Each structure stands twice: as structure tokens, then as C-alpha cells.
Amino acid sequence: MLNAFATTQDDAFQKIAHDYIEQYLRANPEDATELGDHRFDGQLTDYSPDARAKELATQKEFRNKLNAIDGSQLTGANNIDFRILKENIDYQIFQAEELKQAEWNPLVYMQSLANSLYLLVARDFAPAEQRIPSLRQRMEEIPSVIAQAKANLQHSPRVHTETAVEQTQGAINLVREGVAPLLDRAPQMKKDIAPLQEKTAATLEDYKKWLQNDLLPRSDGNFRLGAQKFRKKLRFALASDLSMEEIMKRAQADLKQTQTAIYETALPLYKKYFPNADSATLADKHKVTAAVLDKLAQQHPDDATIVGYAKEVVTEATNFVRSHSLVTIPDTPLDVIPMPEFKRGVAIAYCDSPGPLDKTGKTFFAVAPTPKDWSKERKESFFREYNNDEIRDLTVHEAMPGHYLQIAHANEFSAPTLIRAIFRSGTFIEGWAVYCEQMMAEQGYGGPEVKMQQLKMRLRAIANAILDQSIHAGNMTEKEAMDLMMKETFQQEGEAVAKWKRARLTSAQLSTYFVGATEHLDLRAAQEKKLGKDFDLRKYNDQVISYGSPPVKYVRELMGL
């Protein structure tokens, strides 16, 4: 009898999950496009108070439906996907009832004003003739999104409004120039859409002026989330069993351990580069580490060589993974491309994988030459930061065996519902990529020079988590933040300035790298302890990434750890 009951519970859950996803994609058309469902490509999110109230009621209705199901009776993937959906709905309700970002954060609207258009241009999921009508429809919707933003926004934090001004300029450039690659493929349609293009750019110009002249002078909100909201948001965003206090405690301890490890890695290199150094200098941990990092920064690519170099490194890393038998390599294509102009100047590279509902797409490893308007000094500083060895470490993180490999494996996972595919865990995904950096360095990839960069990036991930919590649940000042980054974790000034800004604009996101990596390393240690000499690294890695991208706590459960 039990099985019959379980089956009805499974059927009931699958129906709820299917209905939930359907309404989610309908209410978030930009997300639908990104995920690879193109039924809503001509629509934008409705940010009106009525729509938001209706959306909250819908979430609560689905929460009640899930409460009627006995989760313990669910079989297979449904058992965990039920909990993932429940946690996600709770997060949505928390955002609607407590965070209320649409009322104070102008960056919320950029998803509709810029990203919605970019998504139609960036991926060749359909011929230009099919995508341009969606582009037209979305451009026609932009004035109503702007009207909603103007009506909703009160008490924005100043840094959010200033950033919205910059991003709106990016949206204007996108409408005027960034959509050209798509329009050039259909000359007649290009001609027809030109007046709308100009009108949309003018509407965005007007919005930018409103942000500068109206919202900015009254932007008196606090960028700090506050301890109570941060604790809740962190729990939802990370879906981790680690508490806020435990995360801070482990980050502080890890900071000291990693500072020691990077010094111990730097010391033999320092002696090689500076054979006449005296013992007092050799004992100065900070000086030795900084000098070696500085020396390694001298070997770097430039605008002309960066894309070619990245292609070589992808091949090198792939061969290393294969020859050391670390994890199964997928056969889905990876294209190394120059980064689109309007995305440049932030990170040097990112991995753009196809959405889980878009099974045919390629993965792009986008690599950035610097923006055209940068000075010679600024370009030099950027490429010193992203030097040859750092690009090798970054390629491990973004592509091989990091994001590209993991997401290709995740897209192979199938379950009765799409819950796990759509509500992927950023903590699992980022944690895997940071874990891969450490694993590759442990295996000797790139020698001590790459290990220096890996440990530097590890310090950066630790600092990210400390910043996130100290800023939003504490009162960390700009000076304290800059000291942590530049003195404790060897970051360049330009990078630290950008991170101080990002840490104020976002909350709970910067913790994902450290927490995810910590959970992955804890998981591996648990499996090593359990299996002893029978532990097989490749078998372990393949198993960890065989379940899609759920929170790490569920992978631990699935592996019986």
C-alpha cells in the first residue's frame, strides 16, 4: 500500500512543480530567456505594486500546496527537489515581504532595461528574423518599466543610484550599438526598427537624467542590510548548514592558514629571484609574498595576445585534467571568444553556459581585451593583475575543470521535474570552481607559480566572505575594507575599490565562493575518511557533479556522508 501512496505523493508533487515553474517563467520572462525557454521573449517583468502583491499571493498558495505533501514519501530525485522548491519559495516570500528591493534598489530594473535585450543578441538560439520581433516588443515595453521604476523607488542607497546611472548608460550604448550584430543579419528589419531604437535610447537618456537629478539627491537609504535581514538572506541564498557565526570563524582561521601557505610557497621563489636577500628580509612574510606576486605579474598578455593565450591555456588545462585522470571531460563544445564591448572592464573572463532548457547551445569562454577608452597605465595595471599564471588559475575556475565542465555535467542530469535545473545553487557552482583551483594546484598544475595565484584567489574568496558579513551585519568602514583587501590579501588598489563597491551593492552573494569551497572540501575530506586508501579522486569528482547543481548539503546526503 505504501508504494501506491508514495506514487500519488510523487504525482502530486510533480504536478505542483510543473505548475510552479510555468507561472515562474511567465512572471519572470527575462529569466525564462536566460534559461532557454523562448515563449516569453517579447515580454518584460511587471513591477507594479498590484503585480507584486499578486506574485506574493501566488507564492503563498504554492507554499500551502507543498505543505499538504508528505515529503518523506517522495521517491528518487523528487525527495530532494521538494525541499529545494520549498526553500526557494520561502526565499521568494522573504524577498517580497522583507527585502522589497523593487521599492529601493534601482539595479533591479536593469534586468529588464538591459539584460533582457542582451540575451536576445548574445545567443544564436534562433534565426535573426525570429529574434528581432522579440527585441522590438521588449523595446516597446521599456517605457512602462521605467514608469514603474519612477513610481516605486524611494530611499535608495546612494551607491545603488550612482551605479544605476552608469548601467543605464550601458543600456543606452546597448540599444544604439550593442544590438547591431543581430540587426545586421536582417537589413530590412534593421531599417524598420531604427526609429524605435532611437526612441528607446532617448527614453533611457531621459531615465538616466531622472536618476541623476531626481532620485540621486534624495538617495538617503542605508546600503547595509542589517544583521537580522542579512542572517536570513544568507541562510536562503547559501542553503548551507553553516551558521553566520561559523562562516566568520572559519573565514578568520582560514585567512591566517592561507597567509602562511602563500608565504611558504613564495619563499623558494623569492630566493630564486633575489639570491642575495638577508635573513631579516626572508622572515618578512608580507614583503616576501608581495615581491613574488609582483615579479609574477610582469609576465602578462596584452590586448593583442589575450584571446589567443586563453585558447592555449584551455587546451593545456584540458590535457592536464585528462592525463591526471581527475574527472570525466564532456564533449560539448567550448568556444573561446572576445568579450562583448559593453561587458568589458570588470572581469577578464567569464563562462557563459547554455541555459538548462537550451540543450543545443555552445558554452562561451569570453575573454576580455580592455575597453578602448582606457589609458595605457590602466591597461598595464589590469594585465599585471591578470598575468599569465593568474589566467591559468582563472581558466581552471571558469572553464576546465570548473564552470564549463561542471555545468555540462549538470545539464546531463535528468529528473521528473525541472526544479533542480532551474533553481541551481550558486554556492555549489562557485564552490566547485574554487575547489577545482585548489585540486589542480595540489596536482601540480602550473607549478608553484600557479599555486601562488590559486592561494591569492583563495585569500580573495575568504576576504569576500568577511567583507560581506562585516559590511551588512556590522559597521565595517571603507578603510577597514581596503586594509583587509590590500594589506591582508594582496589585492591591487583598483580591484579593491571595485570590490568595496560590489560588496555594498550586493549581499550574501560574495559569501558563496568561500562557503561553497569550504563545503566541497569538507565533503571530500568526509569521503576520504570513509574510504581510506580506496578513495579514488576521479570517481569522487564524477559522483559529486552527477546530481545537477543542488546545494552541497544534499549532495552529502545523496552520497551517504
Mark where each language-model region is:
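N-terminal maturation segment of proteins
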Residues: F5-L561
